[in-house]
Amino acid sequence: MKVRASVKKICRNCKVIKRNGVVRVICVEPKHKQRQG
């Protein structure tokens, strides 16, 4: 899980979702998981 000021899709499997007011990127590749912090 990377915590970033700006979250971006890294590959075509990445999805940007908003969960409880937190912007997250979920992906099949665990390295691509991010959240905005």
Curated annotation (Swiss-Prot):
* One GO biological process term: translation
List the GO cellular component terms: cytoplasm; ribonucleoprotein complex; ribosome
Q: Which domain of life is it from?
A: Bacteria
Under Gene Ontology molecular function, one entry of this record is:
structural constituent of ribosome
Q: Which cysteines are joined by disulfide bonds?
A: none
- Kindly indicate whether the keyword Transmembrane helix belongs to this entry: no
Report the sequence similarity comment from the record. Answer: Belongs to the bacterial ribosomal protein bL36 family.
Q: What is this protein called?
A: Large ribosomal subunit protein bL36
The gene is rpmJ
